[in-house]
Structure formats: C-alpha cells, structure tokens
Amino acid sequence: MTSPIRYALIGDAESPHLLKWARALAALPELELWVASSRGFLSGFDAIVPPARRLALATRPDAGGGNIGLLKQLPRLARWLHRVHPEWLHAHYLTSHGTLAWLAQRLYGVRGRLVGSAWGSDILVAPQKSTALRALTRRVLRACALTTSDSQAMAEKMRALGAFDIMVFPFGLETMPPLPPAKDPALFFANRGLEPIYAPERVLQAFASLPGDELRLVVANDGSLRKELQSMADARTTFVGRLDADTQAGWYARSLWYLSLPTSDSVSVSVLEAMAHGCIPIVSDLPANRELVRDGDNGIVLAAGERLTPERLAPLAARADAIAAANRAWVEREALFAPRVRAFVDRLLALEPR
C-alpha cells in the first residue's frame, strides 16, 4: 500500500478561505495534510487536521508586505518543515506566506516542491507598491512548480511577473445553495469589507441614485470605514455588521440585487455566492468581473462614475428568473470547489519529479 503524500499548507488558518482549501485537500485519500498558520486556527480545523499536524506562528501578518514579525518566525517554520518533511509546500498569498516558504527553502534547505496560490491583492496591488515587492513576487512565482489563480485577468499579470505554469479556477463554493424563494425586487444586498479597496462608498452612491422609498439596501460586514459610511448613508440603508453563514445566506436568498464595486479585485467568492443564490450582480468594471458578468445580460457592469438608474435595472428585473437559473447553472458547472481541487492535485501528481 502506498504511503500518503505529506502536503503542507502555509497560510492564515484564521481565514475561512484557507479552511475551505484544507477541507477540500483533507478529503483526498492520497494526501496527509499538515498546516502552518501565520496566526492561529479556526475551530473548523479541529475536525480535519489533528493538532499534532499543525503549527501556529501567532503573528499578525500585513497583506501589503513588510511582515517583519512573520519573517522573524522563519527559523521556527523551517524547523517544523524539516520535521514534517513534506513532498509539497503550498503557500497561500504570495507576498507573505509565499515569501516565507521560498525563504525556508532557500536559506534553510527545506525540501519539497513549492506551489503557490494567489489571492488577489498579492498580485494586483502589492507588486505595484515598490520595486522590491515586485522583485520578491517575481522570485516567489519563479520558484513555484505550479501556481493557481482565480481569474484569467490575474493569471496574465502572474505570467508577466514570471509564473510559467498556472491553473485558473474560481475560489468557488463547497456546495450549491437551495433554489431561492421568491425574491424581493426592492432589496439590495452588499457584503464586501468596509475598507478602501472595496470602495463601499460607491455602493452607497449607486444605491442613493435610485428613486423609490420602497427600495432597501442591506450592508453586511465591517471595517475601518463603517462609521463614515453610516454617516453618509440614506434612511433606506441598514448596516448589519459581520454575519454568520446562515444569516448571510438568508439575505442572499431574499435579495434580488447584489452590489460589489471594488477598485481592484480578482474573481470574488461573494459574487459567486450571490449568483448561486439567484441574485442579479451589479459589479465594477474590472477584468475579473467581466469573466462572470455580461453587462445587460446576466447582470450590470457599472463603469467608474456611472450612475445606477431604474432604466438599467428594469430589463434585468423582467428576466430575473431566467437570469437566476442561468447564473446558478454556470456556478454549478464552473465554480464548485471540490472538483477543481481534485483536478489541481491530479495536475501536481502528474508533474515530473525534480
């Protein structure tokens, strides 16, 4: 009987996104999953990775780079990896955890092949901040035997930085939600972070341009801009803070419209969730968004400075059921996560040993 392959995830295990990856990988019998976290661990890891196969570095990494505290943990991580002796190191978020994994190999002789998953701003934002960050990102990408991107647009930028083998698949859903009940045509929902990169003020402005006392906007999530946004929102807008998964699913299910208008983004899991719940997406004009939304067909692509008008909404509202069915079918066909991870691991195992 063949021994399972030791596979080490390196990332932020307080992120539900890394937990989703861990669940998908742990379900594959040929892998023995180990996880090193730059912070701690969500409780969901308890059911899939035993404590003996986990390392918590207990830092507070900065997604934008400059992670001195994280780099100080490099010797500890390297010692752990030498004990684990993984065949694969899989780093999530290239400018922080990817750098850490690359340095562990380069400076401490850690064995195993490196694979990297880009999450968005590590490719779309961080390399533009400085020449040093750009050079570092390029080195990490070139050290990876395989990388993943959740959009073609981001994959193109990765290739320009030196990545040579990229798998593109959405960071999708674990399961399809049930068919939505009757939608409320007056209800709009938004749940991206209330931080500058997500441009939540654009959501408020777009909604405020629509007439009608019956219209309602529900804004979920939290962030540094919340107080400022609450002061500028009109009386039709309600802020509900961070939501658990079931409560959030309820808002998706009831809302006809979903708003996501960031200034930079790759394929958003939140937009995929909204589409799976039958919402009509209203998104900013970004290359990754255009991979999901065809303006005027299955949603709205709102250009910078463009006002949202009843005339833009009406034709889509008239076809709401057909749009919901088409969007759900696309998500089920293209954006369920487990089959994509299965194909990803098959690709890894097919690579020539170095």
Language model regions located:
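N-terminal subdomain of nucleotide-sugar transferases
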Residues: 1-47, 208
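Donor nucleotide-sugar binding/catalytic pocket of nucleotide-sugar-dependent glycosyltransferases
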Residues: 116, 134-178
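Conserved donor-binding/catalytic core segment of Leloir-type glycosyltransferases
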Residues: 148, 173, 180-208, 218
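Nucleotide-activated donor-binding/catalytic signature segment of Leloir-type glycosyltransferases, i.e.
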Residues: 227-246
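Aromatic "clamp/platform" in nucleotide-sugar-dependent glycosyltransferases that forms part
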Residues: 263
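Short hydrophobic beta-strand element within catalytic cores of glycosyltransferases
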Residues: 280-283
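Conserved acidic donor-binding segment of nucleotide-sugar-dependent glycosyltransferases
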Residues: 295-307, 313-319
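A charged, aromatic-enriched C-terminal amphipathic alpha-helix characteristic of glycosyltransferases
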Residues: 308-309, 318-352
